[in-house]
Regions:
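Ferredoxin-type iron-sulfur electron-transfer modules in oxidoreductases and energy-metabolism complexes
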Residues: 13-26, 166-252
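Glycine-rich phosphate/pyrophosphate-binding loops
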Residues: 1, 141-146, 220
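Small-residue-enriched alpha-helical segments and adjacent helix-cap loops
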Residues: 3-38, 146-164, 171
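Short amphipathic, charge-patterned alpha-helical segments
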Residues: 125-142
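Alpha-helix capping and helix-loop boundary segments enriched in small/acidic/polar residues
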Residues: 2-6, 33-36, 72, 120-124, ...
Length: 252
């Protein structure tokens, strides 16, 4: 992503070192993207890599069948590649001994917001937000834990009373319409307005909508107009718009 130029320099430097050390006769290409949020979706990312506008593709065919340049494509998150190294070095049994029964292993959680020591926390899969707050030194002085985003901008918002829910895919988190996604945890306090947080998130999605699907393109703007009225939200209309956006947009 173009927002992180220093990381691109670092990656290219390390690739040269690895190829020289291991004498690898393979090509590793680092493609620079414009930073569109939608390119986190695998087919949109492939479109961007091909030099086209980052728009999600209709499925089927799936990228495993017809991906980059119409070839079957394996798309991995960098975190998957990171943990593969540990599994190879230390064994699968040791790795799976961490975490919960349904979600073994470890994860890297990016914790930001109203904590004393924000940053990346390596913790067992299925850790709770209360546990992560403790690993970050607790809440900032003068701040009381009020709510949190369990999975970045699109993962939903949960109150502090749900702070003991395991943060991983499916399970209890999904029952509340939330997901852990990128494991980007944002901690909110009693000093934050949740209405302002919701408005800020929707403004982000309006800006980052690729515009390909009308329900998303128009729906984000409509939702913003509704929640700007902080005194009273039309919850029924919000739910209707959200359902249409989810059902009638390619990303879902």
């Amino acid at each position: 992503r173009d927002e992180y130029p220093e990381i691109r320099i670092f990656i290219n430097r390390e690739i040269k070192k690895v190829k020289l050390f291991l004498k690898l006769d393979i090509n590793i290409h680092v493609r620079r993207g414009a930073g569109a949020y939608i390119c986190g979706e695998e087919s949109a990312m492939i479109e961007s890599i091909e030099g086209k506008r980052g728009l999600p593709r209709h499925r089927p065919p799936y990228v495993a069948q017809k991906g980059i340049f119409n070839k079957p494509t394996l798309v991995n998150n960098i975190e998957t590649l990171y943990w593969i190294r540990e599994i190879i070095e230390k064994g699968g049994k040791k790795f799976s001994s961490k975490g919960t029964k349904n979600h073994p292993g470890a994860r890297s959680y990016s914790v930001s917001g109203r904590v004393k020591n924000p940053g990346v926390v390596f913790a067992p899969a299925g850790s709770t937000v209360n546990e992560l707050i403790l690993k970050c030194g607790g809440m900032l002085d003068g701040h009381k834990f009020k709510a949190y985003l369990p999975g970045g901008a699109s993962g939903g918002i949960l109150p502090s009373t749900k702070g003991d829910i395991p943060l991983d895919f499916g399970g209890e988190l999904a029952k509340y319409g939330c997901f852990v996604g990128s494991h980007a945890i944002v901690i909110l306090s009693d000093k934050d307005s949740l209405a302002d947080v919701a408005l800020n998130l929707m403004a982000f999605f309006k800006h980052e909508s690729c515009g390909q699907c009308t329900p998303c393109r128009n729906g984000t703007e409509k939702i913003i107009n509704i929640i700007k009225n902080k005194s009273k939200w039309d919850k029924e209309l919000l739910c209707d718009i959200s359902e249409v956006m989810a059902n009638a947009s390619i990303c879902g």
